[in-house]
Amino acid sequence: MTRPEASGPPDATRLGHLLGPHGVQGGIKLYVLGDPAQVLALKRVYVESRGWLSLRRAEGMPPNLVLYLAGVSSREGAEELRGLQVYATDAELPDLEEGTFYYHDLRGLEVYGAGGERLGTVSDVMDAGHQDLLVVDYGGGTSFVPLQAPYVEVPLAGGKPGAVHLTADAPAGLIGPEPGEEDGAAES
């Protein structure tokens, strides 16, 4: 699995990625990273490498959505968008319920261990099927931490995440080089 590069507009939230065509009239399935209801009210979305596209309509197709985008009117046109990331600006998204946050709010946060030691910095949140992963950069590389794991805590300060904390239940060596690696390179 490769890490998707951030290619959306500034101050935007990644909504998900396009899975492939639905029907013959340009519908395309969207794998949604959050609450699909937040996408239904949007008037436009930003599609990676294509820019802003008007959202003609969106339909629920649990667990995904089907989007009908301006300028995409055929199955072939929808196929060209397969795999691309989809974004919306924060200002266009609905207000969140208290105690919740957008994943992009985690980018740049420090990650701390149970003893308060700094372990790294969140550079991205990656969808990996049924589990979302924090991409954590540490001094010598990158580690992936399951966001929904019971040992991951994201306390809110002023309604926004302030840091990521791993509890004492976190597996040893979760962040850092794999066993047998030295200075980021595997030994042979």
UniProtKB/Swiss-Prot annotation:
Q: Name one GO cellular component term.
A: ribosome
On the tree of life, the source organism's domain of life is Bacteria
**Location, primary (coarse class):** cytoplasm
Q: Which SUPFAM superfamilies match?
A: PRC-barrel domain
GO BP, sorted A to Z? maturation of SSU-rRNA
- InterPro entries in the record: PRC-brl_dom (IPR027275), PRC_barrel-like_sf (IPR011033), RimM (IPR011961), RimM_N (IPR002676), RimM_N_sf (IPR036976)
Signal peptide interval: none
> Which residue range or ranges hold the PRC barrel domain?
98-174
Does Protein transport show up as a keyword for this record?
no
Q: What does this protein do?
A: An accessory protein needed during the final step in the assembly of 30S ribosomal subunit, possibly for assembly of the head region. Essential for efficient processing of 16S rRNA. May be needed both before and after RbfA during the maturation of 16S rRNA. It has affinity for free ribosomal 30S subunits but not for 70S ribosomes.
Name the NCBIfam families for this protein: 16S_RimM, PRK13829.1
Q: Which HAMAP family match?
A: Ribosome_mat_RimM (MF_00014)
- Family per UniProt? Belongs to the RimM family.
Q: Which PANTHER family match?
A: RIBOSOME MATURATION FACTOR RIMM
Name of this chain's protein: Ribosome maturation factor RimM
